[in-house]
Amino acid sequence: MSLYNFKKIMVVPPAKDFIDIMLSKTQRKTPTVVHKGYKISRIRAFYTRKVKYTQQNFHDRLSQIIQDFPKLDDVHPFYADLMNVLYDKDHYKLALGQLNTARHLVDNVAKDYVRLLKYGDSLYRCKQLKKAALGRMATIMKRQASNLTYLEQVRQHLSRLPTIDPYSRTIIICGFPNVGKSSFINKITRADVEVQPYAFTTKSLYVGHTDYKYLRWQVIDTPGILDHPLEERNVIEMQAITALAHLRACVLYFMDISEQCGHSLEEQVKLFESIKPLFTNKPLILAINKIDILTPEDLPEERRAIITKLQEDKNIPVMLMSTVQETGVMEVKTEACERLLSYRVDQKMRTKKVDNILNRLHVAMPAPRDDKLRAPCIPEKASARLLQNADKAERKRKLEKEIEEEMGDDYTLDLKKNYSEIPEEERYDIIPEFWQGHNIADYIDADIFDKLEELEREEGLREESGVYKVPDMTMDETLKEIREIAKQIRGKRFELRDEKRLSSRKNKPVIPRNKQPKVRDRSVQKLVSTMEGLGVDMSGSENANFTKSVVDLRRGQVAVGSKKVPMQPLLDKESSAVVRKTGQPLKRAPSRDTLGIKNLAIRKKAQIMAKRDIAKKVTSRGLKGEADRFIGTKMPKHLFSGKRGNGKTDRR
């Protein structure tokens, strides 16, 4: 875990916003009403409070900014040098120093004007002193506009810096630009560093994390370094130099054997020699990358001699690798981690605290008193168990998955071959089938198939001889007539069913039966033709009952035979109900509004009086009409909720 968390630094507002925040806070958090009729001591206290409150807000906010930013003398030298490279140490200290000076100036302004407010003799004079005090504070902060802007940019950049723990196990990758450093860190960690085929793709430090031997390791990818004096290096290169100089880590120096990075092997070796002082007292590994393009054996003799010369130094291992084919990548990582672990242990052994740790562990070895060999006593059962376990370890059988991979499509899963408790000749016997507790095999005859063939042969002979042939039926005239009538009945039934289906499919409103009776499609002619088609003699049926008059309720017509004759209009005293064939009208009940009324004049007068009474009732009760039966809320909640106080009793 890192010791520094730069993301917690509070936002530094611009000068204008800084002043607005402070003055707005004063306006919101202090009293705002004062009158000239108040005692002068109260007026002085009112404006003194505003000046002191504003000064305290400025003081607290500036102190927060100064304390949040790291002090270069207190942080780790790595972060101190990195901030010097990125932000210019002098400029950084100057900005914080000027904010500290502004804080003291604001305090002095408040002190002076509070002293003057003690002698204010009117509301106007006290108000002007307060206005002057706040104005001078705002002027002081306006002059810090450039410092506040600079510190905000530093804060944003600090919050975007990777979290690097200077005391953790670290691997640093360095070398010329475009030699494969970012590709290597992407392979061994979960980092996602941009990789492009041009120089200086990586412009800042990138950190990835990996695991080795259940320990956490941080891998730092540095920008490319060019071979020129330290004074001429730019900010990008100086970040790598800072990491190499201050972090106690294992250094991986990458070289491009194919020279596709734009630098020859001689230049890469020269850079290695020039920055070698930075590798002092650090584990160092030379990683030769891109062997998938060119191997050391394919190099000319003079270039191969350069690699051979590097390999002569036994303290610096030279390892070959390729990030494209992932050849040697994990070997380089393992070697770097092992070297750093041994280096850290060696460093701890040199400290004074190591004696206290070593004294806790002590292995006592007895001194031999004679030459007699005293072997440890191991029980026979224990040794036999060890031998048995060794035999089991040697007797490793093939798994079904391995057999399947060898045989491919010819493989079939055989689960019975490992039934060691069953004899081999009985291992593949068919398992008997049981039905309702009975073994089916017990009811199967050995000659059942022969008997089945014999039965089939006998049945074939019977069919050929006509045993199963159905005799032809001789139908007389009566039976034929019955069948013909039955056929017609079935046809008629099908027609009626289809008509019903078609009528039900019509997308029309359904009329209730009591509103309009269903008029069936019947007529005298249709009846006569149907009966004649069935063989019935219909001659002499002109005066039959079915030919007499019937009332048509829909059209007010009388059907005489197949013709329709208009009905005579009924009198008022007669009923409008169905007129039977007898011609006797049915009397309807008299209307209720005419009961007990002698003549037409009295009837009209009664109608006018009823209409007036109904209108009066509707208006007075607020009804919508004569038939309005709406009942509203009888106890409105806003009038009947809560306790009944003394002053509310007149409302209920």
Curated annotation (Swiss-Prot):
InterPro entries (UniProt xref): G_OBG, GTP-bd, NOG1, NOG1_N, NOG1_Rossman_fold_dom, NOG_C, P-loop_NTPase, Small_GTP-bd
Keyword hit for Lipid metabolism: no
UniProt KW DNA repair keyword: no
Species annotation: Drosophila melanogaster (Fruit fly)
Region called Disordered, residue ranges: 501-521
Pfam families linked: NOG1 (PF06858), NOG1_N (PF17835), NOGCT (PF08155)
Domain of life: Eukaryota
Residue intervals of the OBG-type G domain: 169-341
Protein name listed in UniProt: Nucleolar GTP-binding protein 1
GO molecular function term, any single one: GTPase activity
Location relative to the cell: Nucleus, Nucleolus
GO cellular component: nucleolus; nucleus
